[in-house]
Amino acid sequence: MSAAPGLLHQELSCPLCLQLFDAPVTAECGHSFCRACLSRVAGEPAADGTVNCPCCQAPTRPQALSTNLQLARLVEGLAQVPQGHCEEHLDPLSIYCEQDRVLVCGVCASLGSHRGHRLLPAAEAHSRLKTQLPQQKLQLQEASMRKEKSVAVLEHQLTEVEETVRQFRGAVGEQLGKMRVFLAALEGSLDREAERVRSEAGVALRRELGGLHSYLEQLRQMEKVLEEVADKPQTEFLMKYCLVTSRLQKILAESPPPARLDIQLPIISDDFKFQVWRKMFRALMPALEELTFDPSSAHPSLVVSPTGRRVECSEQKAPPAGDDARQFDKAVAVVAQQLLSDGEHYWEVEVGDKPRWALGVMASEASRRGRLHAVPSQGLWLLGLRDGKTLEAHVEAKEPRALRTPERRPTRLGLYLSFGDGVLAFYDASDADALELLFAFRERLPGPVYPFFDVCWHDKGKNAQPLLLVGPDGQEA
């Protein structure tokens, strides 16, 4: 117990304020603090209702904190000792023990537990240790700066999480909202179709039913007549019989055919579900971009309409290209005036029965002069048609990748670009109600891009058909 007096003051001091405990409480982890100090440092409880211990960061429940009466009594007893005196010997604390880093009295230093330790007079220790304060203060400031940076990073991350969740919820709400609108419209359309079929079938069947009731009534009447004729005398019987049988044969000959009604309603099958999904997929696409061709970029052989939504290759000899770096001088191509740099975009191009073309995007920094090398590493992501038969994806290879031949040649192409997801997808948009995926590049684009259109040479009129940009109203130029 001889070691206790020198350290008792430290043991009964709050690790936060470094003063003797005032209303001490003990956390669930075992560390003790002044109640006021813990409340000030721990701050507001987390979502689970706990606060972190300032010493070990272990969670503790504020409601589990209660005054540590044993500590409080020890502090009360220690407070009776005159300040600056040994708790055990009541002598002045005049010597500093460097080994244990505590003030001790002469008895503790010469006879007690600090005998043989590195000892200094209190005055000398005061002067020496005071010179260390600036360095310790600097270390404290550096530690504070590091933690403040950590706090700033965490607060920024928290803000990013909140913003990401907000955007996610917004996107989910928007997409599901579109789905609900689409499905509600589809349900209404199918319900109206079912009601139309029910109404028309009801009218037709009631008409047939009325005819059958009338015919059955005639048969019943003839049955009564036959019963009446059977009881007639010979001469009258024979005269009536001929008339009755003649009438009966006529009625039987006029017998209406069995009622047949072909009810045409969609069958709720897997194919029906797939078709609904295809239609809904199109409905979820972003709104059509309002693109226009950039005349300043067009090859000299190309003619751009005044509306900027139609371009074709002229069969007349064109003048040579100028020195404008924005203009294509070899490729019979043109880009849109609109630069795309982020978000989602969707546009459609009417290609009709044009046998040769290429569509996609071009990096804003890619060169438009000379022969173009249509691969992603050169800033071009393209899908094209060759010889009116073969669809080709211009991937990173010596030759374009030939795709499977579609059942029908697309007459309208839909292009979907998502910078966030790193997707450039090409769809057959010929069907006004559905999209069919033809090919997709799945890589993040290095920067802004322009929608790109390779019209290709007119080939003596064989490839003279124009390319048409579809406007937001769904109509070509």
From Swiss-Prot:
B30.2/SPRY domain mapped to chain residues: 271-475
PROSITE patterns for the chain: B302_SPRY, ZF_BBOX, ZF_RING_1, ZF_RING_2
Coiled coil segments of this chain: 135-232
Post-translational modification: Disulfide bond formation at Cys-242 occurs in case of membrane damage that cause the entry of the oxidized milieu of the extracellular space, resulting in homooligomerization.
Pathway field: Protein modification; protein ubiquitination
Record-listed Zn(2+) 2 binding positions: C29, H31, C53, C56
Modification Phosphoserine, positions: S255
A Pfam family recorded for this sequence: SPRY
ZnF endpoints (B box-type): 81-122
Superkingdom, taxonomy of origin: Eukaryota
Catalytic activity: S-ubiquitinyl-[E2 ubiquitin-conjugating enzyme]-L-cysteine + [acceptor protein]-L-lysine = [E2 ubiquitin-conjugating enzyme]-L-cysteine + N(6)-ubiquitinyl-[acceptor protein]-L-lysine
ZnF bounds (RING-type): 14-57
Record carries keyword Coiled coil: yes
Residues that, per the record, bind Zn(2+) 4: C97, D100, H114, H117
Residues that coordinate or bind Zn(2+) 1: C14, C17, C34, C37
The protein's enzyme class: transferase
InterPro entries: B30.2/SPRY (IPR001870), B30.2/SPRY_sf (IPR043136), Butyrophylin_SPRY (IPR003879), ConA-like_dom_sf (IPR013320), PRY (IPR006574), SPRY_dom (IPR003877), TRIM/RBCC (IPR050143), Znf_B-box (IPR000315)
An annotated GO cellular component: cytoplasmic vesicle membrane
Inhibition and activation profile: Specifically binds phosphatidylserine. The binding to phospholipids enhances ubiquitination activity.
GO biological process: exocytosis; muscle organ development; muscle system process; plasma membrane repair; protein homooligomerization
Similarity-based family: Belongs to the TRIM/RBCC family.
Function per UniProt: Muscle-specific E3 ubiquitin-protein ligase that plays a central role in cell membrane repair by nucleating the assembly of the repair machinery at injury sites. Its ubiquitination activity is mediated by E2 ubiquitin-conjugating enzymes UBE2D1, UBE2D2 and UBE2D3. Acts as a sensor of oxidation: upon membrane damage, entry of extracellular oxidative environment results in disulfide bond formation and homooligomerization at the injury site. This oligomerization acts as a nucleation site for recruitment of TRIM72-containing vesicles to the injury site, leading to membrane patch formation.
Swiss-Prot/TrEMBL domain comment: The RING domain is flexible in both the dimer and oligomer. Binding to the negatively charged phosphatidylserine lipids is mediated by the positively charged PRYSPRY domains and is inhibited by Ca(2+).
Name under which the protein is recorded: Tripartite motif-containing protein 72
Gene: TRIM72
